[in-house]
Amino acid sequence: MIEEIKEHVKRLLDEGTISGFLGLKDQHGTIVPHLYKTSDDLDDGFSIGATEGGAPARYPMASLIMTIATTYENGKVGVLLRGCDERALNELLRWNQIPEAADRIVRVGFACKKELAEAHECRKPFPDECIAGEKTEPVSNASLKELESMDVTGRLNYWLREFDRCIKCYGCRDVCPVCFCNVCTLEEDSLIRTGDLPPENPMFHLTRAVHMAGRCIDCNLCTEVCPAEIPLRTLYKKVAEIVNHG
């Protein structure tokens, strides 16, 4: 699959369709985002996130391309997208975050493997514009169903225990591909007191959860980066469901 994607991107660069490509690069065993400028650059560590003996590396590609596309003045720029990345990009477009650069973004999508889709309970593990990979079936959210089987008191106690582990690192906010506010509510001292660890329970996380309702694209990056391993994605999904459907 990686060779198929690489050759496709090389053609886009060589034909002048794009003048840059935001993808991933293996730098001494660490996968990082990288802006490729020429087709020859792709022969030096090009990656789609696979790591040796570990989970695939994932980044908020949509928010990264938003920054690049609005500042990159050398024509169109391509971007490597999973299904969740495409949903994030569509959400940023819906919120008018990249109006002047929207037509300069060329999507290069690929499908996630079944194992990754199942690990993240992905509802759509492939983008609409998919050039490589086998499209796998959506995965149901078993973790959400498990919580819904508890009574109200059980759910409350569960979340209070989870939130007590929070170290207020803001990792969930910083990695979120659709968190784009210039002024963050979570840094407003009138709402969330600064200096408190753990942050006020449950106000800190419920504030963010309500803020994400109608915007969360279900990528699970928040849970993946959380050093306290709080299942934030499950929280956001349920709050969004309540807000959207009552």
Stretches with model-predicted labels:
Residues M1-R165, R173-V178, N182:
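Iron-sulfur-associated redox domains of electron-transfer enzymes in respiratory
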Residues S143-F163, C181-G246:
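Ferredoxin-type iron-sulfur electron-transfer modules in oxidoreductases and energy-metabolism complexes
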